[in-house]
Amino acid sequence: MSVPLILTLLAGAATFIGAILGVIGQKPSNRVLAFSLGFAAGIMLLISLMEMLPAALRTDGMSPVMGYGMFVVGLLGYFALDKMLPHAHPQDLMQKNAKPTRGNIKRTAILLTLGISLHNFPEGVATYVTASNNLELGFGIALAVALHNIPEGLAVAGPVYAATGSKRTAILWAGISGLAEILGGVLTWLILGSMISPVVMAAIMAAVAGIMVALSVDELMPLAKEIDPNNNPSYGVLCGMSVMGLSLVLLQTAGFG
């Protein structure tokens, strides 16, 4: 099994960590969840804009028009997909004082599982493609995806557990959303494998960079603010950028870049 595929599997499996937290009652504070989302957004923004897009543009045969064009395609593709997906709000379900009715909880959990699963599929593709092209960036993307998969697993498992009273069912439902991400990576591995030209890989990377920027700005940062409105999510974003930037410098200095 390839390292990029293993990274994708681990990132998707992080959903189960959140699911377990959602049923054992040891829920992290909203402040911690919000910071982790901001941290993940910071990692994605730095890798996308400072590493993935420049690397794609430096590829022989990749014109600036095609590179930036694919970046915009990624941005627009994310927002088009976002418009088509059913929307439920995990931040409403993670509030400690929220007490919705049993029926509403179950319906929201179904929509939430479906929506998160559809969102997670391209994240699995992005993790695999990035790691295939540059392993150190793949580690960064996998870490960012894993960090924001934890609150997603928590958001699904909590309401399902409240609606069904079954810990096993709650973890299973949350796991479905994580499996969608793993499925994205596995299908990419089966379809692309190593039979792909550098230019095509660069075009995919540019599009993935656009998706990651849109995901960070449109979903992760606003969600962090809604979960914890009393604190600025920018702190988590800046920390994520700083830690990821420092780690990339250290890896390059050590000869892994």
Curated annotation (Swiss-Prot):
* Coiled-coil annotated spans: none
Q: Which residues bind Fe(2+)?
A: 120, 123, 149, 152, 181
Topological type in the membrane: Multi-pass membrane protein
Tell me where the transmembrane regions lie: 5-25, 32-52, 61-81, 109-129, 137-157, 171-191, 195-215, 236-256
The protein's matches in InterPro entries, at most eight in alphabetical order, are given as: ZIP, Zn_transptr_ZupT
Query: Pfam families per the record?
Result: Zip
Subcellular location per UniProt equals: Cell inner membrane
**Which UniProt keyword terms apply here?**
Cell inner membrane, Cell membrane, Ion transport, Iron, Membrane, Metal-binding, Transmembrane, Transmembrane helix, Transport, Zinc, Zinc transport
- What reaction is this protein's catalytic activity? Zn(2+)(in) = Zn(2+)(out)
Does the entry feature the keyword Metal-binding, yes or no?
Answer: yes
Residues binding Zn(2+), per UniProt: 123, 148, 152
Task: Report the family membership.
Answer: Belongs to the ZIP transporter (TC 2.A.5) family. ZupT subfamily.
NCBIfam families, sorted:
PRK04201.1
Descriptive protein name:
Zinc transporter ZupT
Identify the species of origin. Enterobacter sp. (strain 638)
